[in-house]
From Swiss-Prot:
GO cellular component, one term: nucleus
The organism of origin for this protein: Emericella nidulans (strain FGSC A4 / ATCC 38163 / CBS 112.46 / NRRL 194 / M139)
Any one of the GO BP annotations: terpenoid biosynthetic process
Stated role: Glutathione S-transferase; part of the gene cluster that mediates the biosynthesis of the diterpene ent-pimara-8(14),15-diene (PD). Within the cluster, the HMG-CoA reductase AN1593 functions in the mevalonate pathway, which produces isoprenoid precursors. The geranylgeranyl pyrophosphate (GGPP) synthase AN1592 is needed in the formation of GGPP, the precursor for diterpenes. Lastly, the pimaradiene synthase pbcA performs the 2 cyclization steps that convert GGPP to ent-pimara-8(14),15-diene.
Domain GST N-terminal positions: 43-123
Top-level taxonomic group: Eukaryota
Protein name per the record: Glutathione S-transferase AN1595
E.C. code: 2.5.1.-
Amino acid sequence: MNTLNAPRNPTRHPAMTADTLVDAPALPHQNGSTEEKLKERGSFGKLYTYKRSPRALGIQAVAKSIGLELEQVELQPANGVPDFYWNLNPLGKTPTFVGADGLVLTECMAIALHVTNEDSTTTLLGSSSLDFVQIIRWISFTNTDVVTRMASWVRPLIGYTPYSKEEVLKAQQQTTQAIGVFEDSLRDRKYLVGDRLTLADIMCVSLVSFGFAQIFDKEWREAFPYFSGWYMMVMHLPIMKAVVEEVPFVEEGLPNAPPTEPFRAP
């Protein structure tokens, strides 16, 4: 195990499900004066994204939990983007944040950190500088290595990219390898960093949610009980339930076969 992530008071249980989440913590502590200041300020800005975007859910969850007024502007890059958007995000991707003060930010991790930092009393960024770098480590790892491998598994099965059985199998194996990093870390701990919920948990469950919605079926979850239990636990916390109407969860994953219908953007 990475000694930088050594367990503290581990309370993790691999068989945790929605029915057993009886001691889920409430929202992170929010100072009353901070809430009032945020309300008085009005709109914090706009977030260009699409509904249930894995890269936006965590941002929206944190913003709502601390009382930030963050407007969602619907934008699905797969359907094309308006001309003005290229000035905000030269790659035409989402999410993009445009603050009420004119600040423009791309990249979900940068946006999430900016939003979280608006609460001066937050516990979501850890209790030490070492906690903070571990939070960055987990979000970066998930947003790059994990999401990229998951996307290579899912996209050919939904018609977004050309289908190849061998390439899908390769992506499946690579995803399994990456998720193994989570599984090993969560064997003896409840959260990814320290002994309480952090931005790492919030952003990482959001980023992997499309896997649980399409490919991480019952058989797959049984092979990764700690990772799957952690996902269910965090997704059922009030901070996530406030923005996720129904936790993404599939009983039978997409088969490794050519898609039967043309791709439709969500």
